[in-house]
């Protein structure tokens, strides 16, 4: 009978120590040694772990494995951005490497597809398939680090930042998200600063409240409209958690967070003549007057079949200046990797079958109403 091996990438430090103690009858420091080999040296071969005795290495080869997603396709943009289709099981998710000056950001997926049906997002058109496991989330970071040259100088900047802004809604996969974040932050894992790991959410309040007091990372919120009426039209999640409820949850999280330095990043996609009028800017400023926020404007990136258009530069500029009149810090996101469909809202896995979503999807016990497409 074939033994089902434990994928060590599914375990954070606490889980790995428990596994070593209860399943292998080994001490905690051995688990820590293995964790360093995996994440700090990019090692997936027990035989190469030279400070581990041979008896333990042989035992690990029988019962455990280090199995990350593998790259099934890679596309390189002229601006240095790389998009990888990473194979998880029999499907692909997309992971994007974005170099920019002295930093390099990795955009990581949390689900295969997405159930939230945001009308401006190409990923949403796929529907939802499943949540990613811990090994499939953290494995994207592990594989990307290998691809850009963790063991040798490739001339590419190592990963300095991770953003959970790829395929899926992270807070609908809390069971697997939290351990993956713990590994990113762990000093014997990837050792990233909590200010350099960002979770973006479309407004799953139940998940955000679960994060509050349990994990401290930077927070970005996908707001995209200043009123409930408009937001519900383009983001059906608003029918479950309206703007006021969402912002109250954000305030609770920010109050206990050191990573956010007292303010949240508000993401606002600009859709031509939909949510980009000057009145929308004024409404947004009033809405956020009691929320310490940095506003990141995201000009829409068109994709085939989309009903929306990117606003003109003059409309983008007027919207930004209107917000700045209210003393907000406002940035306009640079479009990166759009020539390889890697820009925000364009993450579409070519090999994933396009399936119609049901009216209600179940995730981690949370029922979220969605619209069919």
Swiss-Prot record:
Keyword rRNA processing: yes
Enzyme class: transferase
Active site, UniProt feature: 94, 344
Entry's localization field: Cytoplasm
Protein name: Dual-specificity RNA methyltransferase RlmN
A cellular component term, taken from the record's GO annotations: cytoplasm
Molecular function (Gene Ontology), one example: 4 iron, 4 sulfur cluster binding
Cofactor: [4Fe-4S] cluster
InterPro entries recorded: Aldolase_TIM (IPR013785), Methyltransferase_A (IPR040072), RlmN_N (IPR048641), RNA_MTrfase_RlmN (IPR027492), rRNA_lsu_MTrfase_RlmN/Cfr (IPR004383), rSAM (IPR007197)
Family note: Belongs to the radical SAM superfamily. RlmN family.
Keyword terms, alphabetized: 4Fe-4S, Cytoplasm, Disulfide bond, Iron, Iron-sulfur, Metal-binding, Methyltransferase, rRNA processing, S-adenosyl-L-methionine, Transferase, tRNA processing
Superkingdom, taxonomy of origin: Bacteria
Summary of the function given for this chain in its UniProt record: Specifically methylates position 2 of adenine 2503 in 23S rRNA and position 2 of adenine 37 in tRNAs. m2A2503 modification seems to play a crucial role in the proofreading step occurring at the peptidyl transferase center and thus would serve to optimize ribosomal fidelity.
Binding-site list for S-adenosyl-L-methionine: 168-169, 200, 222-224, 301
Cofactor binding, per record: Binds 1 [4Fe-4S] cluster. The cluster is coordinated with 3 cysteines and an exchangeable S-adenosyl-L-methionine.
Biological process annotations from GO: rRNA base methylation; tRNA methylation
Note: Reaction proceeds by a ping-pong mechanism involving intermediate methylation of a conserved cysteine residue.
Reactions performed catalytically: adenosine(2503) in 23S rRNA + 2 reduced [2Fe-2S]-[ferredoxin] + 2 S-adenosyl-L-methionine = 2-methyladenosine(2503) in 23S rRNA + 5'-deoxyadenosine + L-methionine + 2 oxidized [2Fe-2S]-[ferredoxin] + S-adenosyl-L-homocysteine; adenosine(37) in tRNA + 2 reduced [2Fe-2S]-[ferredoxin] + 2 S-adenosyl-L-methionine = 2-methyladenosine(37) in tRNA + 5'-deoxyadenosine + L-methionine + 2 oxidized [2Fe-2S]-[ferredoxin] + S-adenosyl-L-homocysteine
Entry EC no(s): 2.1.1.192
Residue runs in coiled coils: none
